[in-house]
């Protein structure tokens, strides 16, 4: 019995709950509209616009002005977009890219690196990827009836997320002092 391989618990498996793609333009108008078209072309979904929380005169931003757009992708499409985004980063992330709640995020400089054909009328936009990880059973915290908390032992930690990234994508996690390209 000791020689047999220990079976893994399927409830402990980590999966991607959602992937959020964000382009923050910093101004409303034509550039923001073109950025939303890039996200729509990439994800096949209609993006949502984010408004400024408060006025910043030095940046020329007014409160409630639309300054960014984002789209939330789930399922197989999220995995494909995450794979292409990590390919741009060469599967290298910094340790500080991972949060304590087991999520991680990174940014890319140019959206055309993801395989979208360059269009001069659109321009080039950078974007942020934010990945939320979960385990089976997280629904108890989100459901409408009989909500409960996810236990501490079952939550995804920073170490769990980093280990998942290294195993699933054979990724490299760098410390801040090491150089990173991308």
Swiss-Prot record:
NCBIfam families tied to this protein: PRK04219.1
PANTHER family assigned: 60S RIBOSOMAL PROTEIN L11-RELATED
InterPro entries: Ribosomal_uL5 (IPR002132), Ribosomal_uL5_C (IPR031309), Ribosomal_uL5_CS (IPR020929), Ribosomal_uL5_dom_sf (IPR022803), Ribosomal_uL5_N (IPR031310)
Note: There are four genes for RPL11 in A.thaliana.
Stated role: Component of the ribosome, a large ribonucleoprotein complex responsible for the synthesis of proteins in the cell. The small ribosomal subunit (SSU) binds messenger RNAs (mRNAs) and translates the encoded message by selecting cognate aminoacyl-transfer RNA (tRNA) molecules. The large subunit (LSU) contains the ribosomal catalytic site termed the peptidyl transferase center (PTC), which catalyzes the formation of peptide bonds, thereby polymerizing the amino acids delivered by tRNAs into a polypeptide chain.
GO biological process: translation
Record carries keyword Nucleus: yes
Source domain of life: Eukaryota
SUPFAM superfamilies cross-referenced by the UniProt entry: RL5-like
Gene Ontology molecular-function annotations: mRNA binding; rRNA binding; structural constituent of ribosome
Coiled-coil ranges from the UniProt annotation: none
Keywords: Cytoplasm, Nucleus, Ribonucleoprotein, Ribosomal protein, RNA-binding, rRNA-binding
Keyword Electron transport in annotation: no
Protein name: Large ribosomal subunit protein uL5z
Subcellular location: Nucleus; Cytoplasm
Subcellular location, principal: nucleus
Complex formation: Component of the large ribosomal subunit. Interacts with DEK3.
Family membership noted in the UniProt record: Belongs to the universal ribosomal protein uL5 family.
GO CC field: cytosol; cytosolic large ribosomal subunit; nucleolus; plasmodesma; vacuole
Signal peptide positions on this chain: none
Species of origin: Arabidopsis thaliana (Mouse-ear cress)
